[in-house]
Curated annotation (Swiss-Prot):
Annotated function: Transfers the 4'-phosphopantetheine moiety from coenzyme A to a Ser of acyl-carrier-protein.
Transferase found in the keyword field: yes
Protein name (Swiss-Prot/TrEMBL): Holo-[acyl-carrier-protein] synthase
Primary location recorded for the protein, binned into one broad class: cytoplasm
Source organism of this protein record: Neisseria meningitidis serogroup C / serotype 2a (strain ATCC 700532 / DSM 15464 / FAM18)
UniProt cross-references to HAMAP family, sorted A to Z: AcpS
Signal peptide start-end: none
Gene Ontology annotations for the cellular component aspect, listed alphabetically: cytoplasm
Cofactor(s) for this UniProt protein: Mg(2+)
Record gene name: acpS
EC annotation from Swiss-Prot or TrEMBL: 2.7.8.7
Pfam families membership: ACPS (PF01648)
Binding site for Mg(2+): D8, E57
Length: 125
């Protein structure tokens, strides 16, 4: 059963501006420790940041909380399965919160074009 859906669209120009203004502090605010290790090797660092920002915002919309409490940028991670499909991983506090809400699966789709990134999330009970 669908618990909620969320979508987010991010302008790459916005992420470029934020990254220039705040530098590593911006990445440190939105990326998990695991993502911070991957970030320097990303082929397109701005796209890497933008996709994760959009995915985490869409996640927060799908679960209905916004970014607050256990649903924080640093508790929501994005990785890929063996076939390259994007998937979420969670910090302990968020894992516990999802279990308490009865949310058993959260699916993610992301896409990017020249100047825009899109993330779409479906949370299921």
């Amino acid at each position: 059963m669908i618990y909620g859906i969320g979508t987010d669209i991010v302008s790459l120009k916005r992420i470029i501006r934020l990254n220039k203004k705040f530098g590593q502090a911006f990445a440190g605010r939105i990326l998990t420790p695991e993502e911070l290790l991957e970030f320097p090797q990303a082929g397109k660092p701005v796209n890497y940041l933008a996709k994760r920002f959009a995915a985490k915002e869409a996640f927060a919309k799908a679960v209905g909380t916004g970014i607050r409490g256990a649903v924080s940028f640093r508790n929501i991670g994005i990785g890929h399965d063996a076939l390259g499909k994007p998937e979420f991983f969670y910090g302990p506090a968020l894992s516990k919160w999802l279990e308490e809400q009865g949310i058993s699966r959260v699916s993610l789709s992301m896409s990017d074009e020249e100047d825009t990134v899109l993330a779409f999330v479906v949370a299921e009970k």
